[in-house]
Amino acid sequence: KTEALRSSLFVACFSEVNNSFPMWGYYAADHKGICLGYNLYELVKKYKCMPVIYSDKLIFYREDSSEKNILANTLTKSDEWIHEKEWRIVIKDDINMGKSGIIKDFVLPREIYIGCRQQETVAENNNNRMLHNKKENEMYADLDEILKWAENNYIDVYMPIITRKEYKMMDRALRLI
């Protein structure tokens, strides 16, 4: 029962911050990926997006775990990750989900952030403007396509730059195609 319920859940994760060095490092291919910015109020209202609970206590599943217990487990994370300021959408397998696990008719992002090391990647690929995943050695997104899609959907695009005197990122707007 519990395993069937767990396997029927889809989880999407979001953060309140877009300028965290650790998160760009481990979630965005060491600053070479992208970050999509959404309106949190819209996610809460439309999808019941909920804040992650950070705790030093582990919640265990039991065979007879209730949906409430499973949801609490799904929304709980070690307090060592509190810097992520994470929110999650938890959806039970339903008509809003496509077969690939993608939410149908999901809201558009408000902005797109291109990793600050993306220019290095473009240069490494002989100016073939593809976002590149070195670990898997595969191209997974065409930068020009992303920029064109953003322009067509009136989405702002930024490339954070690292300041010279501090460990901080500042957003720099990119001109679209």
Q: In which residue ranges do the predicted regions lie?
A:
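Catalytic-core loop-and-flanking beta/alpha module that positions acidic residues
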Residues: 1-177
